[in-house]
Amino acid sequence: MIFDTGLPSLTRRMLAATALALAATRAAEAQPARDPLPSWRDGAAKRAILDLVRRTTRERTPDFVPPAQRVATFDNDGTLWVEQPLYTQFIFAIDRLKEMAARDPSLAERPILKAAIDGDMRAVMAGGERGLAEIIAVTHAGMSQDAFNGIVTQWLGTARHPRFNRPFTQLIYQPMLEVMRLLRREGFAVWIVTGGGQEFVRAFSQPTYGVALDRVVGSIGKTEFRLLPDGKSELYRLPAIEAVDDGPGKPVGIGRFIGRRPTIAFGNSDGDIEMLQFATTSPGARLGLFVHHDDAVREYAYDRDTHIGRLDRGLTLAPAAGWTVISMKNDWLKIFPGG
């Protein structure tokens, strides 16, 4: 049986559509909002991140930051992926040095190189920055930029972490991936600002973190332009350092490549202090955070007494500076993706 409501069919369809829309709205409101940081325990660190995002993205509020000015910076080693027992780039350098020495045994005549080849890390560390620079110069120079990128990519595809026996690109921190995803969704430009080699990190930043290579700022080795006999050209890597993007070098790198102070900055060591200072001493809503490695069971526990990723002054300065210290043990429900 059909009843005549007296309403035109178009009006009836509009009323029906309105009723459906209202029902859908009520259903959506009844469902809890999806947690953008599901790998984080509810605590001060998680709330600080969410609060900063909320304050800076709400229009017509005092702390609103226009999308074009929203910048987030992340250190890499120890902030986005594992840095113990040695920085990944240094493990790469040692593996490459051993491979090179097999072809050219004369490399082992240089004491610091012999120590690295023999796995004598105590002697390598005793060589200080000069010794490390020599190892990096030998293993990272004497080739084109493209060739170096290929070598790094190939190594990352086969190398395994000595403790976890997983590729290094799988030992990234799931909670930090979630933060990066949230910030991108809220209109932040996400940058990696690392003390590691800029080209080394660029070789994997896009597939690993979703960070394009032109959003990576790092320590830079010298290069020169070369025009080849076949008419092609290349950037050739030289055995010298042009810029060190660590400590006070990080704000310099940010100014040179980004051109804006970060709204939010993440680090994990004393080498990130100046980056956090650069971010949080500027007007407006800002946030600086340290990842504190205090979980020996799931990852590593270290801070003041380590040569790799030392966090000493940073812990001392954090309370007065208003920086948030993220406890890996207490704030993170999981460490790595997939487990």
Task: Provide a role label for each language-model segment.
Residues 70-84, 276:
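Asp-based phosphoryl-transfer active-site loop
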